[in-house]
Amino acid sequence: MNQKFLDIYTDSIKNPENFWKKISENIFWYKKPTKILNSDNPPFYKWFQDGTTNTCYNAVDLHVKNGNGEKIAIIYDSPITNSQKKITYAELKDQV
């Protein structure tokens, strides 16, 4: 494994709350969480408990909004039917 990956992995294990706080800054939130990890009731941990986001918006719509609508989002490649289809982010947004 490369060293950068190992450093990131080690950080995520040693300091998970800070690690996921940094990661969470890279996604869109309707309401940003004020607390990253609620560990009051182990082993039932709650992450980003008071935050509100939308996974579909982050995975699809945001790419279109940022000017990447014509980039390929999904490649369907079937060896059974010997067919391939490519779907852009814009097409995917219209379909979901």
Residue ranges of predicted features:
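Short His/Asp/Glu-rich catalytic/ion-coordination signatures at enzyme active sites or charged loops
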Residues: 1
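Short, charged, surface-exposed hinge/linker loops at domain edges
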Residues: 4, 24-53
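Adenylate-forming
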Residues: 6-11
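Intrinsically disordered, low-complexity regions enriched in Ser/Pro/Gly/Gln/His and often acidic
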Residues: 12-13, 40
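Short amphipathic alpha-helical segments
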Residues: 5, 70-72, 80
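A short N-terminal helical cap/helix-turn-helix that marks the beginning
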Residues: 13-31, 51-75
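Conserved AMP-binding/adenylate-forming core of the ANL superfamily
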Residues: 56, 74-96
